Amino acid sequence: MTATRLPDGFAVQVDRRVRVLGDGSALLGGSPTRLLRLAPAARGLLCDGRLKVRDEVSAELARILLDATVAHPRPPSGPSHRDVTVVIPVRNNASGLRRLVTSLRGLRVIVVDDGSACPVESDDFVGAHCDIEVLHHPHSKGPAAARNTGLAACTTDFVAFLDSDVTPRRGWLESLLGHFCDPTVALVAPRIVSLVEGENPVARYEALHSSLDLGQREAPVLPHSTVSYVPSAAIVCRSSAIRDVGGFDETMHSGEDVDLCWRLIEAGARLRYEPIALVAHDHRTQLRDWIARKAFYGGSAAPLAVRHPDKTAPLVISGGALMAWILMSIGTGLGRLASLVIAVLTGRRIARAMRCAETSFLDVLAVATRGLWAAALQLASAICRHYWPLALLAAILSRRCRRVVLIAAVVDGVVDWLRRREGADDDAEPIGPLTYLVLKRVDDLAYGAGLWYGVVRERNIGALKPQIRT
């Protein structure tokens, strides 16, 4: 078996949202959407959308399906928890640390105290049902440095990084470790959910729309895809892979987790997001702290753009879709007609690309419509989040622009509320659409302010440059 070959017994399952075209000659889906044509031999290996690796041919097909993002792994049991060391960076959060350690029974744990005012000591964990080692930084070096210190002391094949304000749910580790049956997987992340029920509107909003919660759909981690990164609040990594890329960048005060993900991908590793595994996070729910945190996240975009100029575009859109919506927003009869012409030409181009896959007119129409709608949602989000200072200026100067911005703000908020409400826990306290819409706009204003501040600080506009595809 080669170093990257999937092992026998490993299975993949075609995503339920992927469309099977014709008699199974092609698959349409993935993120971004693509058309994958299948040879007759490949079709014969798939059984109800599932493929089990038995030999070199099936292993190669499974890898193709995974890399095309049209299928997800169904691995056999993975490494043991004894192969994992948990690294916890902490600073001035003794209560959260105790809560976390209590949930880590039977695991080896390294606590890295990053210059706490009241230093963490080994005696603080008397009676804990895990093997704990405490390391100290005499003064704070930041979470990235604390994680690297823990990584340097780790002797196991795998390392789990958990922040001190999280608490894993039962079965989290086993659900993640299975993915490492794929020898190319370097990092797997769980879904981050809320630790406590909503005590105020901000808490209820965070339970539905936390920046750390990447949703309920499993996915590969790839730039410009559904899941473009995973937060380091909770991740499990292959120790050797993290060391090979130099660990976390200690010069970054925010966005170091995004940077690590992208450096691993650039090195040829594969990353997975596994929402079956749940880790609860103690969200900031006081309004001032919450706004400051959103701005802090926005401030990471510009430093990331300096390091990864091809991965930080706030808007990735086709030129045709962009032009169609610009013309539509003009609001004149001629503009709407031109927009319709562009939409028809887009449909014809899609039809030509799909002509070898036994597709119907409805298939082409569905793909074109979904593409234009996705582009509209991207534009609405970007107007309200990344480009809101420009949108505000345009709205002040132009009545027509004011109408466009208002429509974008409402559509973006309502659609996002509807989507996220579907994935909410049944016992979660609901948040109404109006409250959600207001907080979503505050969220975007804070993030955008941090983004623009970072752009000025770094003197780099890469985080604002859209990526327009032909």
UniProtKB/Swiss-Prot annotation:
Membrane-protein topology: Single-pass membrane protein
EC number(s) per entry: 2.4.1.-
Residue ranges of the TM segments: 315-335
InterPro entries: Glyco_trans_2-like, MftF, Nucleotide-diphossugar_trans
Subcellular location as annotated: Cell membrane
Keywords: Cell membrane, Glycosyltransferase, Membrane, Transferase, Transmembrane, Transmembrane helix
An example molecular function term from Gene Ontology annotations: glycosyltransferase activity
Gene Ontology CC, one term: plasma membrane
Enzyme class, first EC level, given as a word: transferase
Main localization, broad class: membrane
Role: Involved in the biosynthesis of the enzyme cofactor mycofactocin (MFT). Acts as a glycosyltransferase that catalyzes the oligoglycosylation of pre-mycofactocin (PMFT), adding up to nine beta-1,4-linked glucose residues.
Family, similarity comment: Belongs to the glycosyltransferase 2 family.
Name by which UniProt lists this protein: Pre-mycofactocin glycosyltransferase
Organism name: Mycobacterium tuberculosis (strain ATCC 25618 / H37Rv)
